[in-house]
A protein has these predicted regions:
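Active-site pocket-lining/capping segments in soluble small-molecule metabolic enzymes
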Residues: 1-292
Length: 292
């Protein structure tokens, strides 16, 4: 499994990650210089989603020249910008869409467009084993956002965010065979610390501090072993059968354990974790996303 970073100048991990996503907003030949200076094994994704149609058309020769300098590139665009797909395909430039896939029809549509990657999102991701088999048979990479509790519902109402799709750092290895690229959702300034947390594969605190959209107070140390394995193959049957209650049991058990001071694994809160937790709870919008 590889990790993607949305490029920003201040990042301490931009050399370490497997994939850099750079924001391209207007025609500039500086893109060619940037990709030329990257190692061959680092994938460069050029995010053109905010470009106008004119900027895209004017930049096609730049994308082609960039591909000649660095073979491992891809274009990230919106489905509404698909007029340039023919040119990208003619020059064998990989591309994929920013829009997430959360139904079988959306997956079929994007695969039919010839994408190289797909973002699997919301409750559809509970079918990740079958989805990955279909995608990998067509040489399509599967991407997820592990750090956000996801649902396709526009209204949360009485829905339980603990039953939404997300992946804890401790469980990320379970997805190794099914997910190709992990990308972090949310403020760009937090990507470095999220990368560290997921590479370390541990989180010693409330899930709500780590997982965006998680409104349930549950300490990760009170989640029993085996829960993540069950969840990987559950297909979210609780939504349409009502038979599976494992997440409800985990929440009830966690509440009882916290009330009585019990934990499955006693991970002491050290100074490093306190610093990390503080970073996760701050906001920093003063970020330079420019790649030059």
């Amino acid at each position: 499994m590889k990790y993607a970073l949305r490029f920003f100048q201040e990042s301490q991990i931009k050399e370490a990650v497997d994939e850099l996503i750079i924001r391209y907003t207007h025609k500039t030949v500086k893109l060619i210089d940037f990709v030329s200076n990257q190692p061959d094994n680092k994938r460069i994704v050029i995010d053109v989603c905010s470009c106008t149609t004119t900027d895209l058309e004017d930049s096609l020769n730049i994308f082609i020249a960039a591909k000649e300098k660095h073979k491992n590139i891809a274009i990230l665009l919106s489905q509404y910008q698909k007029d340039i797909l023919i040119t990208l395909e003619e020059h064998m430039i990989n591309f994929f869409f920013q829009e997430g896939v959360d139904t079988w029809d959306k997956l079929t549509f994007q695969m039919g467009c010839g994408v190289s990657d797909v973002y699997i999102t919301n409750e559809f991701a509970f079918n990740i084993k079958l989805i990955s088999q279909i995608c990998h048979d067509k040489n399509i990479k599967v991407r997820i956002f592990p750090n956000v509790a996801q649902t396709s519902s526009k209204m949360k109402g009485n829905l339980n965010s603990f039953k939404f799709f997300f992946v804890r750092p401790e469980d990320i290895d379970l997805y190794e065979d099914f997910v190709d690229i992990c990308e972090f959702f949310g403020p760009i300034a937090k990507q470095d610390i999220l990368y560290k947390i997921y590479k370390d594969k541990t989180w010693k605190d409330q899930l709500s501090y780590l997982i965006l959209g998680m409104d349930k107070e549950i300490d990760g140390n009170t989640i029993p072993p085996g829960w993540a394995e069950r969840r990987l193959t559950c297909n979210k049957k609780c939504s349409y059968t009502g038979h599976c209650k494992i997440c409800d049991y985990v929440l009830d058990l966690g509440a009882a354990m916290q009330e009585n001071g019990y934990k499955f694994e006693d991970k002491e809160i050290d100074n490093e974790h306190t610093i990390i937790k503080g970073i996760m709870q701050t906001d920093d919008s003063s970020i330079n996303e420019g790649f030059v």
